[in-house]
């Protein structure tokens, strides 16, 4: 009996692997285990009831279609938690004909909480785990990284407000209001926190109607709705069938006026209805280029918080966590050296540790300070003696612009561009805060943020400027 259902499920999984994305398959299909097939009913076991509720809500039709496609005798699919599997298998090997009992939630209505009860099964097939009816809301949820949870997020002074706000909005607390906007550079935790909110809701409030998309996905879905004359369905999905909306990378909507108008309408409707909204971008609303004024105003109406690069204490904890995850053993001096010298984003820290692990394995598994210094020098290239004033002096010499001019209010391109490059390099290669870098040039922190964004964008579009910035980066590493 087990071999038959296992074979059918394996074939069905092969079909699902072809029809679903790799992430969706690995996160939501692969964990399901086939445990029984009898009288046309296949029983699949999932990790817990929240997982099962999400699978039933989003992928039940695909699962049923794939199973009936490989075995026409299959007429129904039922689910149970994996913790009930040993009991089921034990029961199946007994000679007793007495009907087994399984705990199932008692459901009085969709609006009342379920309570555990013990019910006798009328047949040898365990009753399907029942939950309060999950609304069929056509949820849009990006594939979630399994480790991007609140428990795995390393909290420090640079991100504590953003983390607290995300916990509050996921718990539907009134402390942050209905709309939360998070901005930061790449690799500092925006996506991690957004995934964490989604994970929390799936685990604790599986009936919450949640849509989690990137701004580009929202735009593509809107265009599809326009082309297929289905905008009514699109509007209903996001304005009516939604309790919380998560949208990443708002800055990618630059110049997309129609999408901005549509998303602004969605935000307005949701906020007025008391629903929750979480937006992320690489800059604060007022600093986003190519964004409509009304849309900018709507995004600015709630709590706005930024995530800065982690401080040395947080970096030390990140090093310890990432090293443990790769089964590497660092002593206190090694951890301290990495935390002091790898000053970029979390991805940069992880990259350095991965490189250390790879080189150690190639060299027989031995890790010492010489190896760590070599990796930091080649992969990261940071120098703890660097300061924004040293970089300012280097830029002054390279562009033949006086320090006084770099600190002046002049907007001449011959002065403003070197100043912006200097701020960009200071942010990249030093541990100084935005305010400290700003003081070096007699500016405030917002000017530094703007300069970093300008150089990042220009260097990506202008190959000549990109090469110049890379050359200057090499010179900074040699200071």
Curated annotation (Swiss-Prot):
Localization in the cell: Cytoplasm
Q: Which InterPro entries match?
A: AAA+_ATPase, Chromosome_initiator_DnaA, Chromosome_initiator_DnaA-like, DnaA_C, DnaA_dom, DnaA_N_dom, DnaA_N_sf, P-loop_NTPase
Q: Which residues form a coiled coil?
A: none
Give an example GO biological process.
DNA replication initiation
Please tell me where ATP binds in this chain.
Answer: 187, 189-191
What would be one Pfam family of this protein?
Bac_DnaA
Give the span(s) annotated as Domain III, AAA+ region: 143-360
Q: One MF term from GO for this chain?
A: ATP binding
- Where are the residues of the annotated region Domain IV, binds dsDNA? 361-479
Q: Per the record, which residues fall in region Domain I, interacts with DnaA modulators? A: 1-74
- Segments for region (Domain II): 74-142
Transmembrane residue ranges: none
- Keywords, A to Z? ATP-binding, Cytoplasm, DNA replication, DNA-binding, Lipid-binding, Nucleotide-binding
Protein family per UniProt: Belongs to the DnaA family.
Q: Which HAMAP family match?
A: DnaA_bact
Domain comment in the entry: Domain I is involved in oligomerization and binding regulators, domain II is flexibile and of varying length in different bacteria, domain III forms the AAA+ region, while domain IV binds dsDNA.
So what does this one do? Plays an essential role in the initiation and regulation of chromosomal replication. ATP-DnaA binds to the origin of replication (oriC) to initiate formation of the DNA replication initiation complex once per cell cycle. Binds the DnaA box (a 9 base pair repeat at the origin) and separates the double-stranded (ds)DNA. Forms a right-handed helical filament on oriC DNA; dsDNA binds to the exterior of the filament while single-stranded (ss)DNA is stabiized in the filament's interior.
Q: What is this protein called?
A: Chromosomal replication initiator protein DnaA
* Gene name for this UniProt entry: dnaA
């Amino acid at each position: 009996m087990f071999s038959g259902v296992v074979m059918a499920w394996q074939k069905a999984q092969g079909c699902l692997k072809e029809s679903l994305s790799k992430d969706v398959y690995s996160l939501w299909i692969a964990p399901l285990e086939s445990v029984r097939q009898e009288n046309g009913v296949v029983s699949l076991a999932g990790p817990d009831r929240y997982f099962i509720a999400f699978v039933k809500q989003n992928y039940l039709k695909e699962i049923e279609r794939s199973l009936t496609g490989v075995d026409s005798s299959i007429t129904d699919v039922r689910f149970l938690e994996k913790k009930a599997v040993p009991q089921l298998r034990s029961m199946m090997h007994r000679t007793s004909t007495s009907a087994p009992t399984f705990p199932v939630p008692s459901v009085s209505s969709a609006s009342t909480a379920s309570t555990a009860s013990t019910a006798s099964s009328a047949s040898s097939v365990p009753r399907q785990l029942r939950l309060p009816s999950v609304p069929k809301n056509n949820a849009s949820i990006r594939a979630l990284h399994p480790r991007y949870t609140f428990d795995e997020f390393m909290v420090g002074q640079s991100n504590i407000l953003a983390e607290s706000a995300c916990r509050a909005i996921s718990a539907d607390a009134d402390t942050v209001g209905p709309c939360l906007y998070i901005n930061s550079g790449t690799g500092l935790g925006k996506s991690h926190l957004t995934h964490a909110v989604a994970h929390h809701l799936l685990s604790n409030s599986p009936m919450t109607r949640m849509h989690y998309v990137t701004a580009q996905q929202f735009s593509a879905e809107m265009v599809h709705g326009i082309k297929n004359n289905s905008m009514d369905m699109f509007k209903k999905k996001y304005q009516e069938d939604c309790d919380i909306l998560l949208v990443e990378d708002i800055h990618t909507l630059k110049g997309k006026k129609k999408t901005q108008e549509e998303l602004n309408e969605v935000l307005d409707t949701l906020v007025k209805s008391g629903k929750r909204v979480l937006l992320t971008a690489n800059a604060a609303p007022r600093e986003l280029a190519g964004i409509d004024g009304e849309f900018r105003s709507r995004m600015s109406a709630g709590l706005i918080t930024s995530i800065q690069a982690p401080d040395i204490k947080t970096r030390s904890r990140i090093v310890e966590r990432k090293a443990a995850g790769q089964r590497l053993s660092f002593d206190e001096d090694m951890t301290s050296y990495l935390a002091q010298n790898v000053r970029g984003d979390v991805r940069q820290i992880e990259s350095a540790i991965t490189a250390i692990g790879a080189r150690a394995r190639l060299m027989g598994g031995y890790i010492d300070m010489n190896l760590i210094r070599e990796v930091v020098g080649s992969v990261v290239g940071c120098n703890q003696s660097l300061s924004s004033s040293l970089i300012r002096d280097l830029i002054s010499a390279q562009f033949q612009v006086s320090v006084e001019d770099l600190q002046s209010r002049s907007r001449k391109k011959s002065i403003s561009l070197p100043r912006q490059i200097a701020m960009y390099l200071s942010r990249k290669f030093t541990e100084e805060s935005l305010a400290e870098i700003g003081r070096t040039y007699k500016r405030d922190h917002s000017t530094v943020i703007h300069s970093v964004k300008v150089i990042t964008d220009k260097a990506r579009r202008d190959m000549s400027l990109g090469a110049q910035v890379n050359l200057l980066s090499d010179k900074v590493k040699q200071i």
